[in-house]
Amino acid sequence: MSRMISLREAETLAVAALEAVGVPRWEAEVTARALIDAERDGLASHGLSRLPFYLAQARSGKVVADAQARVEVAGSVIRVDARHGLAFPAIARGVERAIPLARELGLVAVAIGGSHHFGVAGAPVERLAREGLVAMAFSNAPSAMAPWGGKRPLYGTNPIAFATPRRGTDPLVIDLSLSKVARGKVMLAKKAGEPIPEGWALDIEGRPTTDPDAAIAGSMVPAGDAKGASLALMVELLTAGLTGSHFGFQASSFFEPEGEAPSVGHLMLAFDPAHFSDGYLEHIEALFQAMLEQEGVRLPGTRRHALRRERGESLELPEAVVDELRAYAVSRV
């Protein structure tokens, strides 16, 4: 069963729940909006189903609820210390500093350390693209994938995202996990008591499984097999390596309430195309038009933009999620 709820009500309830565990108002608003935007864009595995885990970790101290990200700028590098708080405020601080600096310098890097769940990787790059910048984002995560040929998970599912502005229309957004599917989809299947499709994950012995519990105990299958595993290693080095954060095998779970902070890393790059060549926006349209001339082709990000327009100012959520959200807010957790 599902139920309709307005974006405004969903945000109000989520903010109240976050504030109740000690998250300051601005940080609570940024986090709530990120989760609701994920729901609106059809990315429920990164949406409001994550909120109970954030709240439980804030209560236990695994997440520093009142953390306020610290920002330092050195040349073209923006360093953000998330201070073991929620990721979204740290991401927002980095993005807001990156926009003017990228316009000035042409290329900047935002390196975020000591952080938490990155959320929808396409969200911050889309924000940068709407400011006329070409952007990339990378994040590591707690271990869920083994090196190719191994059984012990060492890498996270480690998303990569890219976005570019387009003239007169929505940005093109590429957002992908380096596992065959995002691990959050396995968590949703577990919560619903449903099996997962074969090919998503392996059990602890390295055998294909459709049992979400066995998948969580085992490892996710990398997208593109050995190629995906190599890209996941690259992301570990770009994120945890460059920021001094925990590698996937060192990071604690985003889902378990107890333990030390996950302390993962993120890296974002923002390019101002005007510093690289003239007529970038016109030039890239030639490629997009050649793609769209072929039947069945759509540009990446099209689906999320369409869902956003279709859903407008309301969400259709599972009844259990709405009830849970209201209960957290009313009880002040």
Curated annotation (Swiss-Prot):
Organism name: Chromohalobacter salexigens (strain ATCC BAA-138 / DSM 3043 / CIP 106854 / NCIMB 13768 / 1H11)
Name the record gives this protein: (2R)-3-sulfolactate dehydrogenase (NADP(+))
PANTHER family: MALATE DEHYDROGENASE (PTHR11091:SF0), OXIDOREDUCTASE-RELATED (PTHR11091)
Gene this chain is encoded by: comC
Reaction(s) this enzyme catalyzes, per UniProt: (2R)-3-sulfolactate + NADP(+) = 3-sulfopyruvate + NADPH + H(+)
Protein function: Catalyzes the reduction of sulfopyruvate to (R)-sulfolactate. Together with SlcC, provides a racemase system that converts (2S)-3-sulfolactate to (2R)-3-sulfolactate, which is degraded further by (2R)-sulfolactate sulfo-lyase.
An annotated Gene Ontology molecular function: oxidoreductase activity
This protein's record includes keyword NAD: yes
Enzyme Commission number, as recorded: 1.1.1.338
Family to which the UniProt record says this protein belongs: Belongs to the LDH2/MDH2 oxidoreductase family.
